[in-house]
């Protein structure tokens, strides 16, 4: 300043400015130094403060300890001190002695270890010798086996020559003599199938007929059981009546005890078409679909049936004592074997004698059509008259050997379809051909408990056999429970006594008119009659009641009301028909819900619906290569085979041991679940050609050749065809039958390195993909399929030891394309590190590993490029960079394996993860953070270790310059640094409720990157552990938001070892319920456990999830999130869940809150709306996570409607019925009935339920009474009359709009609406004072009158050319099958049982159903195509598959139940209801007889 004030001389401002700038720079340098010194000093002071605080805390603790000691200690004398000193000396000496003992024990342990090692070596030497001996012995057996095969072939040729000669001799004889002689040969065939009844048990001893009659006379208690066994009904057609008469005479002549034996054979109802099923179909009857019509074949069928019948009787009698409690058939095939025959389900409460009369008329009609129509006079006939008729026909029953399968009355509800009209029109679709084998169904012999036993052991009055059903339904009701007590509307106008009988005794009297049918003699009948009188005299006669007038009126309307009114406006419905065929859905959302399925294709195998493709079939998707030339050759071979296999051909017997070859001559295969598929009946080893791999071939060379029957999906008609496959020379050829192998094959499949084998759903099918085609194959049993897979994999040079070990389970730690070098050979493979094992595959898409390397305790290190294998690899000229890196893996007791890696980043990542997987303590690999974690792991996370204070493990305000973990590429390293910046922004910015979207966006973007790049999941977990390891002052919010972000992160995924170990330790050290930080640590611990239990998530957190975590203190709740679930009656239930809750767990919580049964019993499912806003719903699978559903729905909604506010629309969850089972209706809860009523009302409103206008009003009145209550009449006072009248009118209009069908109210004038409201009010007032439960019961009783109640209807248009026309129709999916209904009237066109559905699903842009027409010879399969919207195709496909698989699960559940277990289950009624099962006997069910407890 002094220089500036001097006036002398001019001032050089430029120099002055430069000088000042230099001074400024000096000041800045000094200031920066001062800042650095201050920063260092501050850090030093902070450390000192921390140390001081820690020391002060320790000192404070010591002071407290000393104070406690001073307070507790008394003044000790010198004697007490001496005593304590002596005690201390004694303890020290005792410790020394213990140490000596421990050392001695350790020495002994070491000696024992050495001894065990020596013994192990000796055992290994012995095992090697034994193995060598076994190998030599097997080779000798193999040579001997080959010699035996040659001998067998020679003898087979001789047998064929003899049979041809025998056939010529037989042709010269008369038809009667030939029939008698053929019976012996066919008996052998039928005996083979007769033994199916006893498979999975010891072979039964066949009992002679005389011995059987003795047994039955000595053991009278079995007679009642036999009454409930199966009976025979003859199959009578135009062309074989005479033969059946002859057969009947021979049966009477050959079986003296025929009347008793015939009670033991199985029965089934004759269908409308009059086609009975042949329970004893011979082998030759199955072998060709074209061979029926010759008289010789009819004769052979008759004789074979007779012998099969007698053989099965002996088997059943010999095992009666051991099998009297069986409740299901022995075979494990589908439940549809009992429902194949399209049997007509009896309507509820009708006496069983009417059904018996229908059977009797069907048997005596020349064409067997007496069961199609029943007159009222026939229906009203008494049970006594019918019993006399049946007794007069007992001779026909005992003399018939070609029987139809008729279920016994106790199984009638189980075996009959629900829909009585399903056989009209083209109802013959339900009737399979008699060529199919019958179901092996045995009636549970629960009625063999004698009266004396019941009296002695159960302390009950003596019972007659016709009362046993009402009192001992234990095993029977478990097979198929009876439907609930509902009123049969057809009997409303009858006498009140008849109504009472039908309501109260439908299970007792009606069904047991059967019992008098088979009474052995008059004495037994008199005994039954006397027993009846005793039973009837025990309980008091219940009072007779008529229906109330209001209920009778509703039932009277319902009798004729289940139909459409003639006049209503269909224009509004027709307008929407074409529009509904064109919706699409959001791919992002549906890819999560349906697991990337678009329109899948299913096939029916072993009674189960098995998915064979997740996308629709195209024209060439199934790879049919049956060219025209091969077809012509197949026709030639077929005609030759027909000429060779005449009536007396032993062709079937030659292959009769193998069920897989029974239908080899047929072009279309019998479905695999139509016969037994035990491996013991598969192709015998001696019969296989030389190319077939023998099961006893345990040599070192793996088999590369095989032949046998497989089922192949055809090309144009998607049906299964049985073909004889021959694998030889790396090529898979297929023929029509084994005899055609000398001709040109029908097709061939070239197996090359580009082929892939993918197992289908539930390991039922195999998808073989080549360069040109995709083939779908299946076998008769899983074991045969596994053998084929193994041989095919050997051909494809897949060295997997066990073909069942597909893609290893678990989350891969690392994966990538590497070059593996071993023993000088190099190969480019896809490597995946899972756990402590390195798997390598041929390609990334391959599911079968080529091999694996166990890494535990292996030596993993980086090596220089000095090994010979590397140099050889470079010399070979492969396409690998010359600058590659090498990692060597040296497992214990194995040679080294070299991995060649192209980049340094990738090499570092692989080296670190391989080292960790090997369990190495090497801390010189990986990043600095990883090395520190490894050191902590070596010291087991010692809390006092200085490693915890390392800056790399602690919170830092500055960004990181390199990732905390090793990453395989530079791009991922850059992303990791950006990820840390995003976490810093989330942590440092204060949470503001109005601007919460900023934090939501940051969290979603960061976690989405980690889901897209799984390599970054370890990185973000390590970053959040680092940023939450230091406690900030309470006024800084940073660390708390770090804990919140960590909670969101661990709810999605978990890091790998050892970072998972570090995370658990970090959470454990910070868990403290007294602080907010500690509460979040406890919440994170819960999230870690749940994520480890249910697996990783698929979608980023939703807005709702992030809001709940940031603002609503999630640590206070075990289920921190909640969402409303809507019901069909307009109410909702809020249900809680966490980040890992699956749909199955969510539904368990919902059912507990609402008092409903499990979805498997109730048929209810959870649905979501479509994000696009269209009227679509998506059914949720049980393993999807609720949070993923909400998140994907939000993302799809934003994409499809970007302009709307994201926070306003959320996913809507609806809980409603998806699968309806009439057998489960008995255990419906009140809530289920209510929701079912409202769901039915929704169908009525939308025109998916047929009812006329009168019945619609009655139903609307019932719903109004349930929802609103009693109808409020207008007040009579002038003051309030106007206001109240307006209120009443408004209520009536709302009811009409809510409960009355749209099609009936659209277009109505004001006057018509007023009259409609007046009629509704009249019906509503009639319900005054009645409870909601009564109204719900009546509503469902009326609704169940429609045969398709509970079915889901889909609008479809048949694709021309089709026999169904080209107009719109309804596809009704219900528990018994698929039905086609007329569009306007909803009358049945045709029904198909699920058994006849071969393939169903997407075909191009349409819905495809392939039907097995077993009754048609000209067209054994039929493919139906329907134009539908793609979402509806997916929905109907999954719905059909669910029905089929649910029946299969029910069959499996009931299969192993026994009567003693069921008897014990009855005593546990309340417990069974708690577990969701149904009680076997309802305590409220009225009965006339005493009940067995």
UniProtKB/Swiss-Prot annotation:
One of its GO terms (biological process) is negative regulation of actin filament depolymerization. Residues 202-230, 245-335, 363-439, 613-705, 1474-1493 are annotated as: Disordered. Residues 20-175 form a coiled coil. One of its GO terms (molecular function) is actin binding. Residues 208-230, 374-388 have a biased composition (Basic and acidic residues). One of its GO terms (cellular component) is cortical actin cytoskeleton. Residues 1121-1451 form the FERM domain. Kidney. Reduced expression in patients with focal segmental glomerulosclerosis. Residues 955-1110 form the MyTH4 domain. Keywords: Cell membrane, Cell projection, Coiled coil, Cytoplasm, Cytoskeleton, Membrane, Repeat. It is a peripheral membrane protein. Residues 245-260, 267-281, 389-409, 421-432, 676-698 have a biased composition (Polar residues). Residues 703-797, 811-919 form the PH domain. SMART domains: B41, MyTH4, PH. It is found in: Cytoplasm; Cytoplasm, Cytoskeleton; Cell membrane; Cell projection, Lamellipodium. Self-associates. Interacts with TGFB1I1. In the kidney glomerulus may play a role in linking podocyte foot processes to the glomerular basement membrane. May be involved in stabilization of F-actin by attenuating its depolymerization. Can recruit TGFB1I1 from focal adhesions to podocyte lamellipodia. This is Pleckstrin homology domain-containing family H member 2. The gene is PLEKHH2.
